[in-house]
């Protein structure tokens, strides 16, 4: 797929994250741009390819537009702009008294996503993705990798959708319309792999990161998780039992974080203690 060259002067910055920045078009209110940081080339191409497939499946996500590049060699994607939207992380930070409402709405989106059956010939299996990430990771030794491979292999298979980067900043809403965004890691498999990211973002990440990335204090993020977990799993399962189930899957997200940061993340590996001990 060839990238369309754009002039970044036509866009206005409105936000950013670990991998890139978001822009609105200055004169066309229906267009937004997600631009990756310099040197990130394959991820935007993978994301738009997947985004088109996911959109065609009927999963609620903004309609993807074009694969683009800037004059200085950065790559990104143009999407249909959802005017007036907010992410669930931003909304929670802005209105902390509504944390329960926002967490329950996000949980409802996740339940619907994880009930969606996928044509498994069209997308990657989450286990294969983790096996690949583990093989590429230079920060685990051979014994640790063998234990992690065994854990991943033993997880029961499911043929349902996985977002792949299920942060509460990657779900947006406006009015009664709700959308998932940032679907570059979309795949299929056991839903627990997805829920690990929710737990990591609310509980394992350090307070400064949560404040900067998700616009709220860590204490509020933990409350978000507690409301989310009760809505997702139902009232019959104690929170401690849910967290014991999810913690190793949150720890596995270390493989993604270490891929992106190119350094070991011991503060996140605590989630892997039950596997590696």
Describe the role of every protein-language-model region.
Residues 12-120, 156:
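ATP-binding pocket architecture of kinase catalytic cores
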Residues 171-195:
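Catalytic activation segment of kinase domains across protein kinase-like and atypical kinase folds
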Residues 195-235, 249-264:
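Active-site activation/catalytic loop segments of kinase-like enzymes and analogous catalytic loops
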Residues 1-2, 115-164, 168-169, 174:
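An alpha-helical support segment within catalytic cores of ATP-dependent transferases
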Residues 1-4, 260-277:
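Regulatory N- and C-terminal appendages and interdomain linkers associated
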Residues 30, 76, 159-161, 178-181, ...:
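Hydrophobic "anchor" residues on beta-strands that sit immediately upstream
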Residues 5-13:
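Conserved N-terminal boundary motif of the eukaryotic protein kinase catalytic domain
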């Amino acid at each position: 797929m060839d990238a369309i060259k754009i002039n970044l002067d036509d866009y206005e910055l409105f936000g950013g994250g670990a991998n890139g920045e978001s822009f609105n078009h200055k004169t066309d209110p229906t267009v937004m741009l997600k631009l990756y940081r310099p040197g990130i080339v394959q991820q935007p191409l993978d994301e738009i390819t997947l985004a088109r497939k996911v959109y065609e499946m009927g999963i609620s996500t903004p309609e993807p537009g074009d694969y683009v590049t800037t004059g200085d060699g950065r790559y990104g994607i143009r999407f249909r702009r959802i005017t007036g939207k907010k992410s669930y992380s931003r909304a929670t930070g802005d209105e902390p008294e509504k944390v329960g409402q926002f967490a329950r709405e996000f949980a409802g989106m996740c339940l619907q996503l994880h009930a969606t059956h996928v044509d498994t010939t069209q997308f990657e299996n989450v286990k294969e993705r983790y096996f690949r990430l583990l093989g590429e990771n230079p920060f685990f030794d051979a014994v640790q990798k063998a234990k992690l491979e065994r854990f991943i292999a033993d997880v029961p298979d499911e043929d349902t959708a996985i977002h792949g980067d299920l942060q509460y900043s990657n779900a947006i809403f406006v009015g009664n319309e709700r959308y998932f965004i940032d679907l570059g890691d979309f795949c299929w498999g056991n839903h627990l792999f997805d829920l690990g990211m929710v737990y990591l973002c609310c509980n394992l990440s350090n307070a400064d990161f949560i404040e900067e990335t998700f616009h709220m204090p860590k204490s509020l993020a933990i409350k978000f998780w507690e409301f989310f977990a009760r809505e997702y799993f139902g009232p019959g399962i104690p929170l401690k039992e849910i967290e014991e189930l999810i913690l190793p899957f949150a720890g596995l997200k270390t493989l993604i974080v270490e891929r992106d940061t190119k350094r070991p993340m011991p503060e996140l590996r605590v989630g892997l203690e039950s596997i590696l001990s």
